[in-house]
């Protein structure tokens, strides 16, 4: 108890007097009727006074039940009252461990809280709790049996006992008046310190809030009536508590009804299994009553209670001061020491994920020292998945750090070259750091949100599927009972037992499927966040570069050079990450292949020594039986000796099991301590080395050198760490195997000594001949030697199989093959994207930048994560196996329903007819059990590999399709804008034609005036056309000059082979010259391709500039035409409504905003022309407007008639053309289509990859369809990818011809 608590002792004592006063006043009948539910304490009995008012409304009480995980409570239990001043509370909890592990020990856990909490200690009970008129401070008491469930193999109970020390409780404190009662609810998770405690991760609290109104809560609410709280990590000895306020929604509960509000905790411990704890919490509605007061009795009770409380107060105060001061000081010192001990770091722990790596490595010792050999390989597979997930996280962190370093290095190089000032560099670096920090926070928040949502969704799906499974089981049991009504009792019992076994296996498979599906969902979420982070890093870089260009801090030429360097370095970064991933995959495959071999080796050794032990025990029994059969022992003597021998054998085996368990426990702790010490020391050494190398990285100016140093360092550290892991695994196996073999050999020797000494003496005492006994002992010795040799041979065979399996695994995951395959795919995708980009007609600088960013995003997600493919393979295998099993079950059910249809042969027909329904059902259930226990076949494994390959191909095709769609959408937007402008221009010409015709017909304009107007307008159009041609010529000349300068620069900077003299020294050998030329050819081709790409990008940008110039000119032209149309409309005095109808007729596809904008422009032209012609034009009179009003209205009809006539002419021409085409005799279209060229894309082979094949590009061609003049563009869809990277041996070719062909291919 802290000092504050000791100073508060008088307050506790004086509170007793205040309680007495409150008791007396509370009994005066102040409880009024209420129409709302009341929150009442546990154990408060309704009053039995006959003077009771009528019912005044329902109330709430907390039903009795089990507290958290503590002792059970009954209806006679006193309620737990809460004192507001108390800052600490004691929870006495008995926690049930998972899977049948019982913990009878009661733990008193001290948890300091910032708010009041429930107390189940002795001070929580009070005599006054029995008075029903105590309304103010009431407690939500929870009914919470804690149940644990592990995902995985959870249908079988684990033998033995364990203590995990995790306490999960839900409690509440009620406050407020009877009309507006509120409750403060707490959820508490305490990871207490025990011998087997472990750090918890991925904690998720799901709290039911159905029927409550919640406020002051930080949880995420779901649509299913839950709210979720999450915490990333909870260390041993720490507690995690959340609280919120709640009120009961009015009208939800009637009198006597209960509201169940359970809470569920899900977390991961060091075993990597997800554990669930569940506490029950219920609210019961109860009617409120009003007590009629008896004033005299209450007054007497008040004075008596006041005097008694005063005496007790002074007495208690004297006793506490006299006797409990020393105890309080000792308790305070103990609690301070306990709190300080909590703050001490655990041994062998470190930051940055090292502690998690150490925990994962500890699990290998747990697996090797496990007492269940059958679950070792399954646990090893789960450990491998967890390690792969951890490796993915490490690689992603490495990728992010490399990207940040590359950006900083590029800015530094730009500053050193003089293209960026140091002040701008510092400013941009600060902005990048801020953006990166915001991105990390966003990623973390999104990760937490996804994990909470996925966990809740998976839990709901699990609940639904398990309920459906239970319903199917009940239906199956009912059907079986119907079939077995006429069968015998024994047959019915056997079928019932078999059916329960089948249902258990089905539940186990269902839980495994759900766990695998949840694991896949989590892995996909991690992958999505990783890809999102990579794309956001690129987006931040490109956004900041565009911002710097816009602000003038970075010149466009420098930005272009910076982006080119960034793109080139990103290709190197992706190549480096592919190498890191392939190396990590190989090292982990080697590590777990070796671990699998170690587990099998340990199992083989245990099988051998167990076989020898069983042989020795059997020989002891055979020795007695042989003497009995020889007549040297009667039956009573044999039974007595057998009983004694079996007792000795059981005693020896029992002692062996106990010794093995105790010694393994000691060795387990010793191995973990040694392993953690060495691994942590190695991690610290590597971290110091990384820090020293990081200082050297800051002085590096070349990005290639930085990546090379990073690759060397990571490769060296990975190899060193894997070597240490392998050595520690082998050492742990040697120690455990030595311990196991020594104990088993000791037990075997004891059995042989028992046979040779004690049992021999007993037999000799009973008159057995020594020669006969000696002969049997010699035979047993030879039999034991032969058995030992046989078991050793079987062990060697299994070891050889394990070695072959490890070698095959390493061959399949060879880093060279994986890296080559990934490089080939990247080259292919690069060609695809370049081909798509080259098909674009025009792109602006900003659009080109956006396309480049999208290409980087596509290349950033071409890698394969380490964990997701393996997890996906497990899910697919489980799905295929389930589908196959369901199909077999259907066949068996059909056979039971119609047994005569199942059998084909006559013998089987007669046999099946003789069987009863019960026997058929029993055989069907046995077959189903056999199918459930059967392992996956090799065909299903191959099918899974094929499905994984198909999914990978689909992802790549989806990336290509998405990129192509973005390009097509961009070009379509440009074409759409041009089409809109052209439509508007055509509409204006139509309106001009109509207005001129009407003005000429109405003699408002003479022919000479019309000619003058048109000539003036024509001169303006010619001047506009001349300006456009001049601008086009200037742009093309500038582009040609730039291309020529670039070509000259490329030739000047080309490789030395272009600058060598034509004559070659006669003494130099031709082979040397050819070798030098061949070594420089690749550089020449790369430079040439880069020059071509730059030239193509420049031409695309130039085309965009020209299109923009033409669009601007065309817009000016439209403006001129609009000016003329508005002038003619003013002369004809066409109203605005009529002009709007005319525009809607000639522009039927235009939207309403476009028409209004065009009409507003025409109105403005009216004003302009009116201002120009104010001096010379005469104002039209009212009679003139009335005169021409009739043909104003006829304009609409005439324009519609002209458009309809033109449309009819086009329709007639199209119909005649169609009839002429149909009269011709043509070959079928399929026979006339001939595709030229052959193209296919790389085939991802399932075999080990060898020599790489060249990748041709799929082309497109145009053919004339049925000689109609229409062009049909045919894009050849490649065949299903045959991604075989094996190439047959090629013939040798002439060097010069091959070089010409390579240059021609580069030009193409």
UniProtKB/Swiss-Prot annotation:
Per the database entry, which stretches of residues form a coiled coil?
455-578, 636-800, 1001-1113
- Changing residue 630 to S: what effect? In a colorectal cancer sample; somatic mutation
Bilayer-spanning residue ranges: 301-321
Record: glycosylation sites: 220
Q: Which residues lie on this side of the membrane: Extracellular?
A: 27-300
Record-annotated disulphide pairs: none
**What Gene Ontology biological process does one annotation of this record name?**
smoothened signaling pathway
- Which ranges of this chain reside in the Cytoplasmic compartment per its record? 322-1308
Q: Which UniProt keywords apply?
A: Cell membrane, Cell projection, Ciliopathy, Cilium, Coiled coil, Cytoplasm, Cytoskeleton, Disease variant, Dwarfism, Ectodermal dysplasia, Glycoprotein, Membrane, Nucleus, Signal, Transmembrane, Transmembrane helix
Establish whether keyword Secreted is in the entry.
no
Q: In which tissues is it expressed?
A: Found in the heart, placenta, lung, liver, skeletal muscle, kidney and pancreas.
Leader sequence residues? 1-26
Q: What topology does it adopt in the membrane? A: Single-pass type I membrane protein
Q: Which domain of life is it from?
A: Eukaryota
From the Swiss-Prot or TrEMBL record, state where the protein is found.
Cell membrane; Cytoplasm, Cytoskeleton, Cilium basal body; Cell projection, Cilium; Cell projection, Cilium membrane
The protein here is known as Limbin
Gene of this entry? EVC2
């Amino acid at each position: 108890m802290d000092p504050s608590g000791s100073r508060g002792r008088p307050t506790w004592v004086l509170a007793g007097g205040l309680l007495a006063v409150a008791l007396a006043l509370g009994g005066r009948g102040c409880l009024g009727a209420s129409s709302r539910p009341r929150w009442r304490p546990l154990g408060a009995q309704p009053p039995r006074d006959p003077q009771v008012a009528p019912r005044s409304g329902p109330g709430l009480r907390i039903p009795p039940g089990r507290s958290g995980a503590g002792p059970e409570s009954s209806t006679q239990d006193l309620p737990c009252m809460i004192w507001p001043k108390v800052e600490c509370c004691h929870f006495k909890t008995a926690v049930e461990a998972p899977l049948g592990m019982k913990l009878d020990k009661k733990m008193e856990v001290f948890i300091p809280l910032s708010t009041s909490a429930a107390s189940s200690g002795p001070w929580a009970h009070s005599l006054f709790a029995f008075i029903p008129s105590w309304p103010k401070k009431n407690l939500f008491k929870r009914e919470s049996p804690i149940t644990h469930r592990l995902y995985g193999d959870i249908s079988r109970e684990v033998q033995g006992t364990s203590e995990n020390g995790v306490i999960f409780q839900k409690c509440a404190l009620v406050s407020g008046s009877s009309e507006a009662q509120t409750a403060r609810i707490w959820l508490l998770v305490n990871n207490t310190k025990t011998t087997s405690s472990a750090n918890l991760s991925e904690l998720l609290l799901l709290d039911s809030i159905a029927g409550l109104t919640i406020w002051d809560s930080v949880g995420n609410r779901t649509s299913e009536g839950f709210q979720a709280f999450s915490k990333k990590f909870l260390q041993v000895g720490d507690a995690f508590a959340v609280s919120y306020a709640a009120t009961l929604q009015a009208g939800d509960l009637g009198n006597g009804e209960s509201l169940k509000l359970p809470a569920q905790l899900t977390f991961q411990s060091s075993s990597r299994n997800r554990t669930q704890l569940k506490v029950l919490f219920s609210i019961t509605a109860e009617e409120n009553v009003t007590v009629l007061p008896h004033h005299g009795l209450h007054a007497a009770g008040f004075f008596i209670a006041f005097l008694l409380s005063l005496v007790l107060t002074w007495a208690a105060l004297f006793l506490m001061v006299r006797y409990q001061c020393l105890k309080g000081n000792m308790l305070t010192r103990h609690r301070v020491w306990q709190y300080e001990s909590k703050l001490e770091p655990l041994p062998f722990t470190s930051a940055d994920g090292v502690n998690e790596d150490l925990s994962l490595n500890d699990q290998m010792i747990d697996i090797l020292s496990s007492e269940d050999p059958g679950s070792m390989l399954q646990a090893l597979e789960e450990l491998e998945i967890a390690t792969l997930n951890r490796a993915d996280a490490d690689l992603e962190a490495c990728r992010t750090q490399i990207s940040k370093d590359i950006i900083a290095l590029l800015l530094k190089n730009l500053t050193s070259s003089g293209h960026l000032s140091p002040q701008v560099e510092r400013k941009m670096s600060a902005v990048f750091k801020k953006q990166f920090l915001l991105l990390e926070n966003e990623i973390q928040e999104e990760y937490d949100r996804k994990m909470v949502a996925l966990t809740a969704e998976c839990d709901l799906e699990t609940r639904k599927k398990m309920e459906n499974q239970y319903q199917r089981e009940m239906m199956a049991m009912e059907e079986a009972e119907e079939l077995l009504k006429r069968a015998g009792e024994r047959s019915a019992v056997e079928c019932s037992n078999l059916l329960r076994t089948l249902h258990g296996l089905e539940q186990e498979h269902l839980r495994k499927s759900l766990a695998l599906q949840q694991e896949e969902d989590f892995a996909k979420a991690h992958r999505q966040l990783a890809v999102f982070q990579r794309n956001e890093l690129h987006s931040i870089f490109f956004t900041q570069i565009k911002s710097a260009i816009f602000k003038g801090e970075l010149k466009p030429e420098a930005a272009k050079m910076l982006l080119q360097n960034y793109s080139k370095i990103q290709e190197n970064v992706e190549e480096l990450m592919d190498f890191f991933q392939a190396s990590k995959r190989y090292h982990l495959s080697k590590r777990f292949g070796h671990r699998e071999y170690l587990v099998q080796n340990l199992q083989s050794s245990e099988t051998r020594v167990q076989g020898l032990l069983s042989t020795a025990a059997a020989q002891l029994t055979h020795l007695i039986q042989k003497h009995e059969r020889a007549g040297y022992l009667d039956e009573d003597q044999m039974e007595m000796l057998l009983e004694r021998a079996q007792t000795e054998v059981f005693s020896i085996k029992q002692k062996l099991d106990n010794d093995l368990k105790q010694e393994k426990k000691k060795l387990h702790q010793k191995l973990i301590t040694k392993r953690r010490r060495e691994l942590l020391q190695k991690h610290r050494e590597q971290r110091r080395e990384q820090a020293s190398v990081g200082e050297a990285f800051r002085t590096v100016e070349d990005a290639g050198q930085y990546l090379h140093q990073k690759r060397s360092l990571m490769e060296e550290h990975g190899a060193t760490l894997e070597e240490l892991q392998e050595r520690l695994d082998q050492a742990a196996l040697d120690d455990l195997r030595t311990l196991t073999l020594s104990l088993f050999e000791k037990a075997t020797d004891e059995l042989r000594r028992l046979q040779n000494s004690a049992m021999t003496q007993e037999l000799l005492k009973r008159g057995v001949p020594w020669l006969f006994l000696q002969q049997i002992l010699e035979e047993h010795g030879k039999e034991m030697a032969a058995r030992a040799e046989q078991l050793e041979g079987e062990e060697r065979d299994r070891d050889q199989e394990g070695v072959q399996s490890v070698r095959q695994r390493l061959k399949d995951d060879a880093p060279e093959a994986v890296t080559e395959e990934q490089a080939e795919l990247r080259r292919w995708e690069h060609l695809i994207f370049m081909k798509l980009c080259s098909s674009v007609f025009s792109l602006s600088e900003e659009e080109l930048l956006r396309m480049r960013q999208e290409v980087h995003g596509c290349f950033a997600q071409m890698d394969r994560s380490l964990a997701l493919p393996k997890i996906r393979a497990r899910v697919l295998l489980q799905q295929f196996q389930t589908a196959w099993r369901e199909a077999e079950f259907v066949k068996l059910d059909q056979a039971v329903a119609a047994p005569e249809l199942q059998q084909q042969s006559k013998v089987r027909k007669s046999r099946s007819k003789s069987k009863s329904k019960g026997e058929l059902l029993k055989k069907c259930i046995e077959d189903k059990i056999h199918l459930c226990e059967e392992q996956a076949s090799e065909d299903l494994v191959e099918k899974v590999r094929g499905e994984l390959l198909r999914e990978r191909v689909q992802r790549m095709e989806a990336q290509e399709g998405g990129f192509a769609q973005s390009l097509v959408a961009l070009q379509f937007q440009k074409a759409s804008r041009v089409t809109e402008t052209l439509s508007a221009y055509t509409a204006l010409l139509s309106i001009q034609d109509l207005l001129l015709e009407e003005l000429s017909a109405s003699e408002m304009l003479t022919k000479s005036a019309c000619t003058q107007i048109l000539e003036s307008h024509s001169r303006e159009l010619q001047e506009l056309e001349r300006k456009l041609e001049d601008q086009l010529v200037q742009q093309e000349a500038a582009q040609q000059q730039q291309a020529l300068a670039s070509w000259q620069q490329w030739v000047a900077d080309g490789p030395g082979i272009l600058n060598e003299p034509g004559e070659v020294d006669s003494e130099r050998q031709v082979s040397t010259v050819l070798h030098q030329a061949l070594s420089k050819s690749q550089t020449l081709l790369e430079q040439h391709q880069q020059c071509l790409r730059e030239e193509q990008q420049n031409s695309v940008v130039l085309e965009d500039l020209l299109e923009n110039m033409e669009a601007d000119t065309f817009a000016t032209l439209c403006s001129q035409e609009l000016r003329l149309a508005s002038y003619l409309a003013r002369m004809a005095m066409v109203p605005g409504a009529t002009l709007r109808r005319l525009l809607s007729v000639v522009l039927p596809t235009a939207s309403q905003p476009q028409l209004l904008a065009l009409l507003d422009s025409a109105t403005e032209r009216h004003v302009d022309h009116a201002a120009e012609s104010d001096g010379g034009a005469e104002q039209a009179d009212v009679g003139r407007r009335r005169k021409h009003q009739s043909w104003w209205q006829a304009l609409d009809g005439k324009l519609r008639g002209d458009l309809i006539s033109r449309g009819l002419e086009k329709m007639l021409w199209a119909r005649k053309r169609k009839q002429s085409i149909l009269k011709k005799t043509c070959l079928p279209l399929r026979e006339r289509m001939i595709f030229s060229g052959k193209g296919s894309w790389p085939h991802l082979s399932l075999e080990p990859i060898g020599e790489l094949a060249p990748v041709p590009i799929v082309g497109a061609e145009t053919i004339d369809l049925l000689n109609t003049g229409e062009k049909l563009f045919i894009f050849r869809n490649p065949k299903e990818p045959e991604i075989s990277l094996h190439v047959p041996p090629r013939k040798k070719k002439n060097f010069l011809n091959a070089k010409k062909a390579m240059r021609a291919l580069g030009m193409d």
